[in-house]
């Protein structure tokens, strides 16, 4: 049957359409509600992590700035003052600071959280593992901001290297932090305790810095390292940062950004798989 406008007036058909519409609305509503719940979990977890740093943040910044600054000064005296060399030194130092804060510090922090049973405390709350790891990673990324800004300003105003950072630089910095934080989280959850996590992260840190084209061009590395460095995230972090602050973002840079996205997803997923709220899990 049809009404005066030519539309179907069959009650069964109308009922099916109404039910479909209600179901679709319900799915959309439940999806929004779940997203809002995850966002609240993330905010409160991040707020708690940052609250713990209220008395320690200064020394974290000093620690994360000291080694990159010393390395920058040493290489400045050793390699000369050419703009290309200085650009490698500055972006390499920022990459080192990111490794220290995002990978090394987070890995050790997670390892030491195992000892007093901190994860059992978090297990008492209705929170998801990926959100918990994302909050820990965000804390590490935030901690790396002051030291990276300091290094960038020193490069621009003391070394006189022309810097043209853009919104792409911010995107690369965030992805770099999360990709290295994912690696640190995986090591931390994989380690038996804080001491083991500390030893492993301190071994990994120089390897992913000095066996990749972080401070020197890739073609200056031994041929073997030119191949193996393709599987190290700092290769893409340093290359992308260098291109963005120099204002020379190309299709290769976007490819490296895409690889950082893949590395971030894989490492954070692997870390969430290794997270056990309780020792017997």
What are these regions (language model features)?
Residues 2-167, 171-179, 183-209, 213-236, ...:
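Hydrophobic transmembrane alpha-helices and immediately adjacent juxtamembrane helices
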């Amino acid at each position: 049957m049809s009404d005066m406008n030519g539309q179907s007036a069959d009650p069964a058909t109308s009922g099916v359409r109404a039910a479909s519409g209600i179901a679709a609305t319900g799915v959309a509503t439940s999806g929004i509600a779940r997203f809002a719940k995850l966002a609240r979990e993330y905010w409160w977890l991040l707020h708690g992590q940052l609250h713990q740093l209220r008395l320690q943040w200064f020394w974290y910044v000093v620690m994360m700035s000291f080694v990159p600054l010393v390395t920058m000064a040493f290489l400045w005296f050793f390699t000369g003052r050419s703009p290309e060399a200085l650009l490698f030194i500055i972006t390499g130092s920022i990459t080192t600071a990111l490794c220290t804060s995002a990978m090394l510090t987070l890995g050790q922090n997670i390892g030491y959280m195992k000892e007093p049973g901190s994860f059992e405390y978090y297990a008492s709350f209705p929170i998801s593992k990926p959100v918990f790891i994302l909050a820990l990673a965000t804390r590490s990324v935030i901690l790396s901001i002051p030291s990276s800004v300091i290094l960038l300003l020193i490069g621009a105003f003391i070394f006189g290297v022309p810097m043209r950072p853009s919104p792409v630089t911010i995107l690369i910095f965030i992805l770099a932090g999360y990709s290295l934080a994912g690696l640190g989280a995986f090591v931390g959850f994989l380690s038996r305790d804080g001491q083991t996590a500390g030893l492993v992260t301190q071994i990994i840190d120089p390897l992913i810095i000095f066996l990749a084209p972080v401070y020197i061009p890739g073609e200056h590395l031994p041929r073997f390292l030119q191949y193996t460095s393709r599987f190290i995230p700092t290769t893409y972090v340093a290359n992308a940062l260098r291109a963005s602050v120099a204002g020379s973002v190309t299709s290769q840079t976007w490819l490296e950004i895409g690889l950082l996205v893949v590395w971030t997803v894989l490492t954070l997923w692997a870390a969430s798989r290794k997270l056990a709220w309780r020792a017997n899990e």
